[in-house]
């Protein structure tokens, strides 16, 4: 098998709100959109994000009422503190403050208007706390 692209698809109530949140604050571009659907991409990301409106007929019946929950969109970034400051300046509410984990990850989280958790992270370099 050769994978040529990847995306995560999330069911939300307001597709436009989630799509706008990622385009405005995280630099995604809208690749395709239709009623109840938006596909987003970034030139430097190996994964796209697709938002589907909950209840959409095209979804399998047992998935129509599912809501994006229990998952985290995690993006590793080069300048974690800079991104934190930028998002705060843009008025984005930080829902988990910057913290360091024992396994070397540093991260903070925000939520989009539909409650989708977005985490920005980096990894501690040797000698960095």
Give names to the regions the model predicted.
Residues 1-6, 29-74, 84-111, 122-129:
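Vicinal oxygen chelate
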Residues 18-23, 87, 115:
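Conserved active-site tyrosine of GNAT-family acetyltransferases
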Residues 117-121:
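Structured catalytic cores of enzymes that bind and process phosphorylated ligands/cofactors
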């Amino acid at each position: 098998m050769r994978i040529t692209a990847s995306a995560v698809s999330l069911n939300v109530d307001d597709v436009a709100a989630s799509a706008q949140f990622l385009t405005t604050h995280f630099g995604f571009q809208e690749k395709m959109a239709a009623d109840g659907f938006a596909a987003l991409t970034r030139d430097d990301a190996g994964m796209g994000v697709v938002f589907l409106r909950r209840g959409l007929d095209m979804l399998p019946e047992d998935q129509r009422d599912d809501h994006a929950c229990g998952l985290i969109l995690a993006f590793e970034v080069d300048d974690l503190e800079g991104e934190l400051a930028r998002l705060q300046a843009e008025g984005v509410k930080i829902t988990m403050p910057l913290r360091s984990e024992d396994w070397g990850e540093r991260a903070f989280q925000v939520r989009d208007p539909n409650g989708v958790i977005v985490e920005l992270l980096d990894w501690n370099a040797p000698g960095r706390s």
